């Protein structure tokens, strides 16, 4: 995949990486300078595109690809083994998924849980929102595949660089600072409750947790938990099986990092979203190649937030 726009943390890049597709993004003028059927080399490691490669370049990159595939195969020896740091601390390695069918890949590759189920992708590439039963099927499929291992489901994280036309979100000058993620869900409670009900119902099949995106204040957690309580009451009155689940948040804004002690009183767990946290802290549009040099998670302020 080669695109003219999109930075290294855009979701197109995230999905390409997850699917093992070589990708080079933000290549200015590529659509004008490349013709259909033209031979290209996309070097996703160096972020380089070679047009009309010579035989020597083709030979070089075929060799590189063979070496890369062998390196991937060599990692199989670590399958099923515990993950331990040099200092002897035991860790768990989780996988992130965008579709229910991705869960099996996590299991097959030795993943010890799902750290992030990006549920927004269930809402994309369609002309209406998924029903409660459709979402229930997706979430329960993942829970069953993980067989008791932890599954963290992030509620609808829409807006910003993830547009869904049928949700009718107004075009904004600064979409990353606007009506998105938990802000959208708390204003569209029926859509939100449909998702929450599906998650609660699916929780009976595994170790599911709910994670709220882009939280900036304590009240957002309280409002979400109140809606979850409403959903539980409804499911009980309808005689539908469910399981209550822990509710955590993504810490991906400077405000959440600064008041993390207060948020911890309401949230069962934190997940640090370094992509957005870095972007908001450094005041950098993560999809703008002109300022991408400022997008650096190793800046001292990033460690201050952590």
Task: Describe each region flagged by the PLM.
Residues 73-306:
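Conserved alpha/beta-domain cores
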């Amino acid at each position: 995949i080669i695109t003219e726009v999109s930075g290294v943390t855009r979701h197109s890049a995230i999905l390409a990486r997850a699917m093992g597709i070589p990708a080079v993004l933000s290549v200015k003028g590529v659509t004008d300078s490349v013709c259909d059927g033209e031979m290209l080399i996309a070097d996703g490691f160096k972020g380089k595109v070679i047009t009309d490669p010579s035989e020597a370049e083709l030979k070089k990159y075929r060799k590189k690809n063979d070496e890369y595939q062998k390196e991937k195969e060599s990692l199989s020896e670590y399958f099923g083994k515990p993950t331990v740091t040099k200092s002897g601390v035991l860790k768990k390695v989780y996988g992130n998924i965008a579709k229910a069918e991705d869960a099996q890949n996590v299991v097959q590759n030795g993943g010890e849980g799902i750290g992030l189920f990006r549920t927004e992708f269930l809402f994309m590439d369609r002309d209406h929102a998924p029903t409660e039963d459709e979402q229930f099927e997706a979430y329960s499929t993942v829970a069953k595949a993980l067989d008791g291992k932890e599954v963290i489901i992030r509620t609808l994280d829409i807006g910003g660089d993830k547009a869904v036309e049928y949700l009718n979100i107004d075009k904004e000058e600064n979409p990353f600072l606007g009506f998105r993620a938990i802000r959208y869900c708390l204003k569209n409670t029926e859509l939100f409750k449909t998702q929450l009900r599906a998650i609660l119902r699916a929780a009976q099949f595994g170790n599911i947790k709910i994670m709220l995106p882009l939280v900036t204040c304590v009240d957002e957690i309280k409002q979400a938990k109140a809606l979850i309580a409403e959903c539980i009451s409804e499911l009980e009155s309808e005689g539908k099986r469910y399981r209550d689940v822990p509710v955590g948040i993504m810490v991906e804004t400077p405000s959440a990092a600064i008041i993390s002690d207060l948020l911890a009183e309401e949230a069962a767990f934190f997940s640090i979203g370094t992509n957005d946290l870095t972007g908001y802290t450094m005041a950098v549009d993560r999809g703008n190649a002109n300022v991408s040099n400022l997008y650096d998670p190793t800046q001292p302020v990033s460690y201050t937030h952590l």
